[in-house]
A protein has these predicted regions:
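Catalytic core of the metallo-beta-lactamase
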Residues: 1-85, 144-147, 153
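Accessory terminal helices/loops
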Residues: 53-66, 75-155
Length: 155
């Protein structure tokens, strides 16, 4: 894109053949349906371990990298994140912002790696507190449990 060089990363998990375009020097990554604001894509034919590896790879990017996501499911994702981590003040603040943006009809599909590390339960699946909350000892199993909980979530 212009003078910006992108690396193409294979990021399976959401769907076979899913790719992300990463320009770390430009602090930009087009992540499609792997990461959403406070969420992640469903698993359509791929596996939870594949998705966990893809999310974990994206999480290695610097915190100030802007993520361009594929959809705006932020309001629903925020309700789920708040239900999973009711004591997380960063999630509560961001969930309130999601409600305001949804009420105003504002599309929200840009975020940063740092914001997602603080407020996205799927990127937090490997943290000891999250694994303990979910009764899991393995980050991949913790992610799989969260993904199933989100699939079943009606909040």
């Amino acid at each position: 894109l212009g003078e910006t060089a992108f690396e193409i990363w294979a990021t399976p998990g959401h769907a076979a053949g899913h790719l992300c375009w990463v320009a770390e020097e430009a602090r930009l990554a087009a992540v499609g349906d792997v990461v959403f604001v406070m969420g992640c894509g469903r698993l359509f034919g791929d596996t939870a371990p594949q998705m966990w590896r893809s999310l974990s790879r994206i999480a290695t990017l610097p915190d100030d990298v802007t993520l361009i996501t594929g959809h705006d499911y932020t309001a629903s994702n925020a309700r789920f994140a708040r239900a999973v981590e009711p004591g997380n003040a960063a999630i509560a603040e961001r969930a309130d912002e999601a409600e305001r943006r949804a009420a105003a009809g504002t599309f929200w599909a840009l975020t940063t790696v740092g914001e997602e590390k603080r407020t996205n339960p799927f990127l937090r699946a490997g943290e000891p507190a999250m694994m303990a909350t979910l009764g899991q000892s393995d980050p991949g199993a913790s992610f799989a449990r969260l993904r199933q909980m989100k699939n079943d979530f009606r909040g």
